[in-house]
């Protein structure tokens, strides 16, 4: 009696695939992750950047560096053996305010424009080497707004100026008929930008008593600045010239009358003196 034996070939491809899948799972499970968060803070206020090592690996030292064009610059380190060590260039400017080898926080006491940029936190871990994360700090300046108006010869100029960092945007909330708008942008050495918008209103009398609204957009927030145009005094050039000419004429007539009066008085006194002598 013959027996039929079927031999199944061993699949090397399936074995290799299984090995690669298992290796990928292990690597993903063991992958080290550093969690950071970018911050935006106002100029000349404190600011903090945080880093968190999201695994159970043991860190030996934590280093904070500032990213620069050529190479990162060491700022401060922390370890259990040496504590906090701040580089001379950053003394009295920063400190590590959360001491730990898993979670670390640096704080700037009074941020300036030079502090804006990106920073790296490096965890020197046992078995994984240096694991880094990056957090960026953005510095902003709140808008300083000026709103005023001025009557000219035959029109009304309303000016709204906003200075901030980053550059603000200026809008108007007024009727558009008979109104022209011009905008000028100026960058300052301190990093702020001024945006000045001027409304040219051709019929100023119709704007008297009405409210003008200047809207400033900065960092996603719109703020309204309001002002009511009060009655002003404006003259046309011909009218102004006529008034000036009339005033000059009156002054000349007054001088002439004054001169004639004194002349007559002098003649009268002279004639009286002659009569007495005779």
Curated annotation (Swiss-Prot):
Residues on Cytoplasmic side: 260-278
Signal peptide: 1-30
CDD domains named in the record: IgV_1_MRC-OX-2_like
Keyword Membrane: yes
GO biological process: cell-cell adhesion; cellular response to lipopolysaccharide; cellular response to type II interferon; heterotypic cell-cell adhesion; negative regulation of canonical NF-kappaB signal transduction; negative regulation of cell population proliferation; negative regulation of interleukin-6 production; negative regulation of leukocyte activation
Extracellular side: 31-232
GO cellular component: axon; cell body; cell surface; membrane; neuron projection; neuronal cell body; plasma membrane
Molecular functions (GO terms): cell-cell adhesion mediator activity; glycosylated region protein binding; protein binding involved in heterotypic cell-cell adhesion
SMART domains: IG, IGv
Ig-like V-type domain location: 31-141
Membrane-protein topology: Single-pass type I membrane protein
Carbohydrate attachment residues: 95, 103, 110, 157, 181, 190
Compartmental location: Cell membrane
Swiss-Prot/TrEMBL keywords: Cell membrane, Disulfide bond, Glycoprotein, Immunoglobulin domain, Membrane, Signal, Transmembrane, Transmembrane helix
Disulphide-bonded residues: 51-121, 118-136, 160-214
Gene3D superfamilies documented for this protein: Immunoglobulins
Record domain Ig-like C2-type: where: 142-232
PANTHER family: OX-2 MEMBRANE GLYCOPROTEIN (PTHR46841:SF3)
Quaternary structure (record): CD200 and CD200R1 interact via their respective N-terminal Ig-like domains.
Known function: Costimulates T-cell proliferation. May regulate myeloid cell activity in a variety of tissues.
Protein name (database record): OX-2 membrane glycoprotein
Gene responsible for this protein: CD200
């Amino acid at each position: 009696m013959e027996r039929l034996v079927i031999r199944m070939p061993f699949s090397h491809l399936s074995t290799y695939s299984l090995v690669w899948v298992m290796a990928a799972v292990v690597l993903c499970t063991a992958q080290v992750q550093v969690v950071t968060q970018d911050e935006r803070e106002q100029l000349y206020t404190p600011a903090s950047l945080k880093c968190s090592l999201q695994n159970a690996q043991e860190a030996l030292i934590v280093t904070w560096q500032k990213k620069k064009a050529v190479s990162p610059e060491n700022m401060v380190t922390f370890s259990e053996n040496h504590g906090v060590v701040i580089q001379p260039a950053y003394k009295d400017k920063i400190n590590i305010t959360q001491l730990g080898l898993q979670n670390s926080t640096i704080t700037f006491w009074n941020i300036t424009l030079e502090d804006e940029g990106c920073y790296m936190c490096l965890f020197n871990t046992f078995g994984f080497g240096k694991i880094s994360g990056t957090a960026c700090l953005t510095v902003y300046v709140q808008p300083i707004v000026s709103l005023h108006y001025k009557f000219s010869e035959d029109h009304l100029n309303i000016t709204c100026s906003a200075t901030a960092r980053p550059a603000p945007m200026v809008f108007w909330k007024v009727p558009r008929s008979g109104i022209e708008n011009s905008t000028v942008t100026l960058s300052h050495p301190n990093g702020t930008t001024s945006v000045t918008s001027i409304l040219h209103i051709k019929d100023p009398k119709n704007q008297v008593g009405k409210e003008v609204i200047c809207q400033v957009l900065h960092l996603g927030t719109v703020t309204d600045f309001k002002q009511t145009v009060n009655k002003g005094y404006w003259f046309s050039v011909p009218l102004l010239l006529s008034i000036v000419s009339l005033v000059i004429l009156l002054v000349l007539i007054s001088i002439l009358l004054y001169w004639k009066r004194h002349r007559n008085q002098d003649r009268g006194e002279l004639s009286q003196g002659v009569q007495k002598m005779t």
